[in-house]
């Protein structure tokens, strides 16, 4: 196959329609509404394909790393399947790490080669395959104004959505939907099957729509273009250079965290980020210089005495939405819970969930069955036409590591668990559902108000959840899903999300309910079309918080896995605390969160 860049097929994921299209009849008759849970039911085969794409692929130990793969993640020794839960704290309290794996034992999977191939997506000098796919469609078929409007709607929703596994999965599904909506019937071109052949990966979606945000227009600082006297830049393109430095930090951290999957989540455990063997020198330098990176993308830089910031504006808008939603509580707004079930499907059996139950086990079993079936169904297409970088995983022996679960869909992409928490926050995923966004705000307020005495915030969580469970009127009308998900997360994860973790706190600020939930509905066609046209013509895709806070997040979360030397850790805690205070974000001890949770 001809290539236009090293390892990038010139045809990308563009493919003529297969004889049996998996879209349900009438799937493209409705007007497109981004992040609509009902869309997931229109193509169950695509959902299963994406679930499989969210998994790490293991190969037999004898398989060698493809010579064409260039990566800084060395292949790790094979591990027994199911060992991931025992890494760094185990699946539950008190679990012990087993003896080293016997290379001759049955059932071994080597996930090192796949981790090595996957990290190549996260590099500044590697093309974005989502951008490349769009460009190929543009050259081959031209992009209509209607496509631009739908794509703009998807991009706007991604900017307002939480950075989480559910959002990444939805973005992947809807990117395929938008492309097929406009090109399947007229041009017989489809993206269904592209993830199964590795022409696109879930990491490509994560990078394009969430990590780098290729469509973002504010240079990483919301409102920068609206400033009356914008800060002078030293040279043309300086803003993009500054943003690329952040992107390098975020992508380097992601590469290192993916590297932990090379040995089932245990690689680099205990290694120091300040020179330990668990990280690369480039990452160590980027982490040490995070403050310089953040300073250039900080909306509070140069301001004295705190005051207005991106987060104070976001908090005010959140309050306005909550008040408006309360006033319209009896207005019959339709609520859907498909994303609650999707969250359960993605996170059951992973370190994000620490309390098991029949519903969780059923979700994990359903996911395993769907992934296995989809992997087998696409075996022939994968062997005929796999992307060169992943060619070795198209052979008959490789298979998804069902025990690790869909960790590639998560933001941090590691399987580490500590303090009964995991890298992926279940509660951040819940922010994708309108009723849960509102319920989470009420839940936090109830925890804070529960005791007038000096009872610790942690001790207030379980009684408040108990009260919520006992009062059906106080719950969203979701058949008990919300309370079940809170129980599954556990009090430690709730405590971490609400009061401790800067990633969760900043995600709460990033999620824009006006963008996610405040647009015209599908049955208001004219208003919806006007809304999408304004998004497309305005070309103002601004984030809600400045990228300086994202730089802090990636440094913080990497330091939780690759613990730095004490001096570097103390410096980071001091500088990170100052940045959070300037943005009016109040959290419990960062030292506690760094050392206790993950």
From Swiss-Prot:
Binding site for Zn(2+) 1: 128, 131, 208, 214
UniProt entry tagged with the keyword Lipid metabolism: no
Main location: host cell
Residues the record lists as binding Zn(2+) 2: 425, 428, 497, 504
Disordered: annotated span: 1-23, 66-107
PROSITE patterns to which the protein is assigned, alphabetical: HERPESVIRUS_UL32
Keywords attached to this entry: Host cytoplasm, Host nucleus, Metal-binding, Zinc, Zinc-finger
UniProt keyword Ribosomal protein present: no
Transmembrane portions of the chain: none
Gene Ontology annotations for the cellular component aspect, listed alphabetically: host cell cytoplasm; host cell nucleus; viral envelope
Region named Zinc finger 1: 128-214
Binding residues for Zn(2+) 3: 310-311, 546, 583
InterPro entries: Herpes_env
GO MF term set: zinc ion binding
Record function comment: Plays a role in efficient localization of neo-synthesized capsids to nuclear replication compartments, thereby controlling cleavage and packaging of virus genomic DNA.
Family according to the record: Belongs to the herpesviridae UL32 protein family.
Record's protein name: Packaging protein UL32
UniProt organism field: Human herpesvirus 2 (strain HG52)
């Amino acid at each position: 196959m001809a290539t236009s860049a090293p390892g990038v097929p010139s045809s990308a994921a563009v493919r003529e329609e297969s004889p049996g299209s998996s879209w349900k009849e009438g799937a493209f008759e409705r007007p497109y509404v981004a992040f609509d849970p009902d869309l997931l039911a229109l193509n169950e085969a695509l959902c299963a394909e994406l679930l499989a794409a969210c998994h790490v692929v293991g190969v037999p130990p004898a398989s060698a790393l493809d010579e064409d793969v260039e990566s800084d993640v060395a292949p790790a020794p094979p591990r027994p399947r199911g060992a991931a839960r025992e890494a760094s704290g185990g699946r539950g309290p008190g679990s012990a790490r087993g003896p080293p794996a016997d290379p001759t034992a049955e059932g071994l999977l080597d996930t090192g080669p796949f981790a090595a191939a996957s990290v190549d997506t996260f590099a500044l000098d590697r093309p974005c395959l989502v951008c490349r796919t769009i460009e190929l469609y543009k050259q081959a078929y031209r992009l209509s104004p209607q496509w631009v409007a739908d794509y703009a709607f998807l991009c706007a929703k991604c900017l307002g959505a939480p950075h989480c596994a559910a959002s990444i999965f939805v973005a992947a599904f809807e990117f395929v939907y938008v492309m097929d909506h406009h090109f399947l019937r007229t041009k017989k071109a489809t993206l269904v099957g592209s993830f199964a052949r590795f022409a696109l990966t879930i990491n490509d979606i994560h990078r394009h729509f969430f990590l780098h945000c290729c469509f973002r227009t504010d240079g990483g600082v919301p409102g920068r273009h609206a400033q009356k006297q914008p800060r002078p830049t030293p040279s043309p393109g300086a803003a993009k250079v500054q943003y690329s430095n952040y992107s390098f930090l975020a992508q380097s951290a992601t590469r290192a965290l993916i590297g932990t999957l090379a040995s089932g989540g245990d690689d680099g455990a205990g290694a120091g980020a300040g020179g330990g063997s668990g990280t690369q020198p480039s990452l160590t330098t980027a982490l040490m210089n995070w403050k310089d990176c953040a300073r250039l993308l900080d909306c509070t830089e140069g301001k004295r005495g705190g005051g207005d910031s991106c987060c104070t504006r976001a908090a005010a808008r959140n309050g306005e939405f909550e008040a408006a939603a309360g006033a319209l509580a009896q207005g019959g707004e339709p609520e859907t819970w498909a994303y609650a079930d999707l969250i359960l499907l993605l996170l059951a059996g992973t370190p994000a969930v620490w309390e098991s139950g029949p519903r969780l086990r059923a979700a994990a079993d359903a996911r395993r069955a769907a992934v296995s079936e989809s992997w087998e169904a696409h075996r022939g297409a994968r062997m005929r036409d796999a992307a060169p970088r992943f060619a070795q995983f198209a052979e008959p022996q490789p298979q998804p590591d069902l025990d690790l679960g869909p960790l590639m869909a998560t933001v941090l992409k590691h399987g580490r668990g500590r303090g009964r928490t995991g890298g992926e926050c279940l509660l951040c995923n819940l922010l994708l559902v309108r009723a849960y966004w509102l319920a989470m705000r009420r839940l936090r307020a109830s925890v804070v108000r529960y005791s007038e005495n000096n009872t610790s915030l942690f001790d207030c969580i379980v009684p408040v959840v108990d009260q919520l469970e006992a009062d059906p009127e106080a719950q969203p009308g979701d058949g008990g899903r919300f309370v079940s998900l809170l129980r599954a997360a556990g009090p430690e994860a709730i405590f971490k999300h609400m009061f401790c973790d800067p990633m969760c706190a900043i995600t709460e600020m990033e999620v824009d309910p006006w963008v996610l939930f405040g647009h015209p509905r599908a049955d208001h066609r004219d208003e919806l079309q006007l809304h999408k046209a304004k998004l497309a013509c305005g070309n103002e895709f601004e984030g809600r918080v400045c990228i300086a806070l994202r730089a802090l997040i990636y440094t913080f979360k990497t330091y939780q896995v690759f613990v730095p030397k004490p001096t570097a850790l103390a410096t980071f805690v001091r500088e990170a605390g100052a940045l959070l205070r300037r943005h009016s974000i109040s959290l419990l001890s960062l030292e506690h969160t760094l050392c206790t949770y993950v």
